[in-house]
UniProtKB/Swiss-Prot annotation:
Motif Cell attachment site, chain ranges: 286-288
Protein name according to UniProt: Insulin-like growth factor-binding protein 2
Annotated region (Disordered), positions in chain: 112-168, 188-210
This protein's UniProt keywords: Disulfide bond, Growth factor binding, Growth regulation, Secreted, Signal
Protein's organism: Gallus gallus
Domain notes: The C-terminus is required for IGF-binding and growth inhibition.
Amino acid sequence: MALGGVGRGGAARAAWPRLLLAALAPALALAGPALPEVLFRCPPCTAERLAACSPAARPPCPELVREPGCGCCPVCARLEDEACGVYTPRCAAGLRCYPDPGAELPPQALVQGQGTCARPPDTDEYGASTEPPADNGDDRSESILAENHVDSTGGMMSGASSRKPLKTGMKEMPVMREKVNEQQRQMGKVGKAHHNHEDSKKSRMPTGRTPCQQELDQVLERISTMRLPDERGPLEHLYSLHIPNCDKHGLYNLKQCKMSVNGQRGECWCVDPIHGKVIQGAPTIRGDPECHLFYTAHEQEDRGAHALRSQ
C-alpha cells in the first residue's frame, strides 16, 4: 500500500496492525455477535526501545501521544484541521481523522496521509472520549496497543484518547465495531442495474447465517487465532486471506476484491450473490469488472435453465 510520505522502514512495518484493522473493519461490522471480538496487541515497549527515544522526541506541545502503529516514543498529537493519516501521529483528544468528503477511496486517502483532524459531528454516535488527554508517554507497559485504528466509515480514524492504553496484565483489547457504510458503497458499487436486483435478492435470502457470513466467520476465526509477529516481522501472509465482501443482507456483493499491496490495487472479480461462486465469463481485473452486466446475463441463463427443468 502507498506509504504517504513515510519511510518504508520500521515505522511502516510498525503500522501493519492498523492496516489490518482497516481491511477488517467491514468484516467486523458484518460479523455481528456470532464471533468473539477479534483481538490485536502490540509487542512490549522494552527498556531498550524506550532508551532509544531521543530527548527531541518530547517537544513542547499541547498533547503528547505515542508514535503511529506500535511505536513507543512520544510525539505531538495532530491538532484540529491538521493533516493526518495511517502513518501520521494521532489526532488530539476529542478529534478524529476524516478523509476529504469527496475522496473516491477514503481508506486509501488515509493511508496516504490526506485526512484532516476534526471533531465528530455527533460524538454520541462515534463514541468520542470525554476522558483526560492521552498520557505523556511515561507509562510503557507490556500491553500497549495501536490505538489509532482505521475503520471504513468513510475512513475515520480514532483520536488520541478514544481509548485508554491497556496496562500490564491485560492482554486483549477488542476492535471497535462501527458502521461501515462507505466501504460497502465502494466495494458494492456495481451501477444502477445491480440495484434493480435488490428485491429478487431479498426474496431469495437464506435463513440463518448466509454462506457469505459463514465464510466471513471462518476468516475472522482464523485471524483471531493467529500468532501475529511483532513489528519486525512481515505480515504478508495476511494478504493471502480473502475477506468476503457481504452486503447488509448477508449476501455476497457482486464485486469481490483482494486487498491492495504496495500501492497496487488488488484484483476484482464477479460472484453470484447467493453462493459466492465466480460468474463465468466475467473478467478478473485490477479495476471495476462491471459485474452488473455479467450478473444480468448470468441471471437470465439461470432462469432459462430453470424453465427447461420445469418442462
